[in-house]
Amino acid sequence: MSRLHRVIFFAIATTVVAFGQGYFPHVTWGGGWQMGVRVVNLDSATTAAATLSFYDNSGNPLPVPINGTIVAGVYNFTIPPSGAAALSLPADGTSVEGWARLDTNGGSGAGLVMFTYNTTGKPDFSATIPFIPDGSGCIIPLPASTPQYAVPFDNSSGNATAIAFANTDSSNANPTVELYDESGALIASAQLSLTAKGHSSFMLTDKFPAAAGNRGTIIVQTDIKKVGVLALLVLPNGTITTLLPLGQ
């Protein structure tokens, strides 16, 4: 992820889900990255009790410095009716990555995550990372007997694609990743290993050299239904575009 961590981006996502059961498939802070989380209670009558749980690439609880205080992987807070909570993670220190789960009990939760990397004399760039509801590996939850997702990629003309996976289940996952070019020809494939509650992210060409100079479609098939997938398209000028997967 060192190449991805050098990319400058700001990410924001909002998805309204009753009781806020879901997750963010990629989070990062430190190493110049600042991360913000904002959770809104859309219920005008009921207080929401919210929990954010953070996990590292190996599925272990990830200590996080939230609002100046380090917590041991789990942060509990409440949101008043029609209220909101803003959480901040600093840009200083060593870069850290993983994924985060949001659960709210009572009220009606909506999640928002922000990442920013500020470079003096250069504009901030933006992209979107979604809050994914439980039971779906993508923002558009289309059920399938074997969970399968299609994600576009573009590594042509100086563009670069990064991809992230989050295993939100308590069992190991072994997703199969296949890359097809625009003619429909299979150019690369591999099976990944994700530990329980684990996470992985990488530039596509780091694991699939055949993707260099190509564009097409990434097909991800998972052996369990609780693997979230997300891709980011990095343009030559540093601008980031989120490539949301679609269920098949």
Give residue ranges: language-model regions.
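Positively charged n-region of N-terminal signal peptides that target proteins for export
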Residues: M1-R6
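Gly/Pro-rich, tryptophan- and cysteine-flecked surface segments typical
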Residues: F19-Q248
